[in-house]
Amino acid sequence: MTYRNQKLLEAVREAPCMACGVEDGTVCAAHSNQMRDGKGRSLKASDYRIAALCFKCHSELDQGRKMSREERLNMWEEAHRATVGWLFDNEVISLKR
């Protein structure tokens, strides 16, 4: 089942780009492009598999030609980990006790 959370996607818009650090108002949730994360022909991955990326980095990730497939995967994974850290550090995500 695919997880959806609009509040999470909106919160990511407040983060800096986790690839280049820019805070230019274009940052949004870039979903994983990997099948293992639920990506399908007409399906986005779950909302918990996102990375905060600016328009430029998101475009390069999805349609760019500057990086190899492996480099794109590594870029997204690093940005995803940084995004999860940012979400916890900024108390967007917290643990229930």
Give the predicted meaning of each segment.
Residues 21, 55-58:
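Cys/His-coordinated zinc-binding microdomains
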Residues 1-10, 38-45:
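Short, intrinsically disordered, charge-biased short linear motifs at domain edges
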Residues 51:
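Active-site cofactor/substrate anionic-group-binding motifs, chiefly glycine-
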Residues 3-30:
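Short cysteine-rich loop/turn motifs with clustered Cys
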Residues 38-48, 59-97:
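Polybasic, low-complexity binding patches
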Residues 25-41:
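Short recognition patches in nucleic-acid-associated and regulatory proteins
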